[in-house]
Amino acid sequence: MSWLEKILPKTTKASGRKEIPEGVWAKCTSCDSILYKAELEKALNVCPKCDHHMRISGRKRLEYFLDEGDRVELGTQHEPKDVLKFRDSKKYSDRITAAQKSSGEKDALVAMKGHLKGIPVAAVAFEFSFMGGSMASVVGARFVDAVDQCLEHNMPLICFSASGGARMQEALISLMQMAKTSAALAKMTEKGLPFISVMTDPTMGGVSASLAMLGDINVGEPKALIGFAGPRVIEQTVRETLPEGFQRSEFLLEHGAIDMIIDRREMRDTLARILAKFMNLPSTEQEHRVA
């Protein structure tokens, strides 16, 4: 032992590097900032560094949006069926099972009724993680169930779209949902009940070509991709470079395709004020309540 080792205090080796539990941190998909997940969830999955609106599940979106305590889910009796016995690289029934397992949902639309700042409403939200939020028979059935509740109880309807379009595995059945949902919304118009469409990233295909663009007010979240065919498909077809930001909500607002852009963190307050004006309701939450 050297003289230096004799005069220095003995040290012990660390038992090992402490592992950080999984799920504590998240990475912004826009600016790559590392974010504390609990704080990100409080901000409704909007990055506090760059304000990028990350995708969230349809169920979580409705839980953020509707008042706590009296939310009732609609259309739970509807479940997908492989009527056509469709098969591509795998069976449609197997795709349904896999999507249900990965998303935790039975199909691509969650529908609820409840209150928004005391105003009785029905709200639906697409679940993009379920086969790209594709519109199929169950989506149409649940959407119509929500409309029927609005017609019965004189309530407005809010829809949060996040979809790649019609579900090819249901062929013509999925395309018929475009007409089915549009016809249901026509009944809302006849009765003078507001329908607000909120288009989130992405809202494409048959959904954008039907119910998503039929709102009395059409809203986009910041930088949401909204259109029919995607920009790459269009560029390959027309053989031209598209303008910067083409099909983003800011581009659509500038060209009059949507009415407004609302930050997700301000969605509840803004839509509650709009609905109060639409329905000639008092401004206080208590006065909106139905006896």
Curated annotation (Swiss-Prot):
Name of the gene encoding the protein in the UniProt record: accD
Catalytic activity: N(6)-carboxybiotinyl-L-lysyl-[protein] + acetyl-CoA = N(6)-biotinyl-L-lysyl-[protein] + malonyl-CoA
Native species: Pseudoalteromonas translucida (strain TAC 125)
PANTHER family: ACETYL-COENZYME A CARBOXYLASE CARBOXYL TRANSFERASE SUBUNIT BETA, CHLOROPLASTIC
Record protein name field: Acetyl-coenzyme A carboxylase carboxyl transferase subunit beta
Domain CoA carboxyltransferase N-terminal positions: 24-291
Positions bound to Zn(2+): C28, C31, C47, C50
Biological role: Component of the acetyl coenzyme A carboxylase (ACC) complex. Biotin carboxylase (BC) catalyzes the carboxylation of biotin on its carrier protein (BCCP) and then the CO(2) group is transferred by the transcarboxylase to acetyl-CoA to form malonyl-CoA.
A Pfam match: Carboxyl_trans
Cofactor dependency: Zn(2+)
GO cellular component: acetate CoA-transferase complex
Stretches annotated zinc finger (C4-type): 28-50
